[in-house]
């Protein structure tokens, strides 16, 4: 789910923390990718027709493999170095959110049956996406494929996006890539969205800078977490009716949730019973993650025969097509001779542009007295 309304809040009150980048601008970037979230997305959209998912001759779902294979090769061709991180066991506090998702999925399944009886194809298309389940087998299959493609792979002890953030904070990757905005709550220095979007959509990568975010909102990390809890997160309920704008206003005014609760009109804004906001803070501040001390990341050339044996031998993909895609990758990475190889493994530069619906506030002042983030000055040197 992420954080409700956070993207718009940042666009309005800290636009300097956001910038668009071309996909090709991530040349030589090492990026930790929330693979579990993207598997779910691929199973919803790749090869889907009505309620039918992409399957092989044996009836096994292959949407996740097709999606990950295609997107991974696109990144490798562009000189991007992905690291795939998969969800481990969800934190106990997420149980309530997971139960809600289960209820919604079951309600969608019931509504889907009615839509099929009525022959409503539009409803069938919409509701079938809400019934998608990602199994342990699906994740293990993508892990296997990623390893055959020569990528570093991790199964996080808990939330994948928390480990992505930890890898970024340790300087092992340039950014964490996820569509979930709660990745910022784990204080990842950089968050990249749209990295796995299909090339046909021509979406630029939307990059968030955490330091500029805090500067733009004039908040500490602790205060930002409190704002996100009030907006609505996966770990606990929020106070209904407050919303993102008031959440920012009240935390800036009262300092933290405790200060807000002392002044809040509880008849207008009823506080959830036994509200575990303090426990939610701990999960964001001290999550279970892969240990990064002494950790090194290694990429190798794809094992073509292993990829073919798995995708074609086990999953009935078209061998000619898979070999052609792998040959195209090899060609792309060697194009231009030695100069191209040096570019892939060496340094480069990108041009940045500020993104936001509103202009940067004058003299560094935003709403509620918040200082606007500084605009980028153009060229940024690569570090990873």
Curated annotation (Swiss-Prot):
Binds 2 magnesium ions per subunit. They probably participate in the reaction catalyzed by the enzyme. May bind an additional third magnesium ion after substrate binding. GO terms for molecular function: 5'-3' exonuclease activity; 5'-flap endonuclease activity; DNA binding; magnesium ion binding. PROSITE patterns: XPG_1. This is Flap endonuclease 1. It is found in: Nucleus, Nucleolus; Nucleus, Nucleoplasm; Mitochondrion. One of its GO terms (cellular component) is nucleolus. It comes from Micromonas commoda (strain RCC299 / NOUM17 / CCMP2709). Mg(2+) 1 binds at residues 34, 87, 159, 161. Residues 374-384 have a biased composition (Basic residues). Belongs to the XPG/RAD2 endonuclease family. FEN1 subfamily. Keywords: DNA damage, DNA repair, DNA replication, Endonuclease, Exonuclease, Hydrolase, Magnesium, Metal-binding, Mitochondrion, Nuclease, Nucleus, Phosphoprotein. Its EC number is 3.1.-.-. Phosphorylated. Phosphorylation upon DNA damage induces relocalization to the nuclear plasma. Structure-specific nuclease with 5'-flap endonuclease and 5'-3' exonuclease activities involved in DNA replication and repair. During DNA replication, cleaves the 5'-overhanging flap structure that is generated by displacement synthesis when DNA polymerase encounters the 5'-end of a downstream Okazaki fragment. It enters the flap from the 5'-end and then tracks to cleave the flap base, leaving a nick for ligation. Also involved in the long patch base excision repair (LP-BER) pathway, by cleaving within the apurinic/apyrimidinic (AP) site-terminated flap. DNA binds at residues 71, 159, 232, 234. Residues 123-254 are annotated as: I-domain. Its main location: nucleus. Interacts with PCNA. Three molecules of FEN1 bind to one PCNA trimer with each molecule binding to one PCNA monomer. PCNA stimulates the nuclease activity without altering cleavage specificity. Residues 337-345 are annotated as: Interaction with PCNA. Residues 1-105 are annotated as: N-domain. PANTHER family: FLAP ENDONUCLEASE 1, FLAP ENDONUCLEASE FAMILY MEMBER. It is an enzyme of class 3 (hydrolase).
């Amino acid at each position: 789910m992420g954080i409700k309304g956070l993207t718009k809040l940042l666009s309005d009150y800290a636009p300097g923390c956001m910038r668009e980048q071309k996909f090709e601008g991530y040349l030589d970037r090492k990026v930790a990718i929330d693979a579990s979230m993207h598997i779910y997305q691929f199973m919803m959209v790749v090869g889907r027709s009505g309620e039918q998912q992409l399957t092989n001759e044996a009836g096994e779902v292959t949407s996740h493999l097709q999606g990950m294979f295609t997107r991974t090769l696109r990144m490798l061709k562009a000189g991007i170095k992905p690291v795939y991180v998969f969800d481990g066991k969800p934190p106990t506090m997420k149980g309530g959110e997971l139960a809600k998702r289960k209820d919604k999925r079951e309600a969608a399944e019931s509504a889907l049956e009615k839509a099929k009886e009525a022959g409503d194809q539009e409803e069938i298309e919409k509701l079938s996406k809400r019934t998608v389940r990602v199994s342990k087998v699906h994740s293990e299959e993508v892990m296997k494929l990623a390893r055959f493609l020569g990528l570093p792979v991790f199964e996080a002890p808990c939330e994948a996006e928390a480990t992505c953030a930890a890898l970024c904070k340790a300087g092992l990757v340039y950014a964490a890539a996820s569509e979930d905005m709660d990745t910022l709550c784990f204080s990842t220095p950089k968050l990249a969205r749209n990295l796995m979007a299909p090339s046909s959509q021509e979406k630029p990568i939307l990059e968030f800078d955490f330091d500029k975010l805090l500067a733009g909102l004039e908040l500490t990390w602790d205060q930002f977490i409190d704002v996100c809890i009030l907006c609505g997160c996966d770990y606990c309920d929020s106070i209904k009716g407050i919303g993102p704008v008031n959440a920012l206003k009240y935390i800036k005014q009262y300092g933290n949730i405790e200060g807000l609760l002392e002044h809040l009109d509880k008849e207008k804004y009823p506080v959830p019973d036994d509200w575990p906001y303090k426990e939610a803070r701990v999960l964001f501040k001290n999550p279970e993650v892969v240990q990064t001390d002494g950790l090194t990341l290694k990429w190798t050339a794809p094992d073509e025969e292993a990829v073919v044996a798995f995708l074609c031998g086990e999953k009935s993909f078209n061998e000619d097509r898979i070999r052609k895609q792998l040959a195209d990758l090899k060609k792309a990475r060697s194009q231009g001779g030695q100069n191209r190889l040096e570019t892939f493994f060496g340094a480069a530069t990108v041009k940045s542009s500020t993104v936001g619906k509103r202009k940067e506030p004058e003299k560094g002042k935003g709403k509620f007295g918040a200082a606007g983030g500084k605009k980028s000055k153009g060229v940024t040197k690569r570090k990873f």
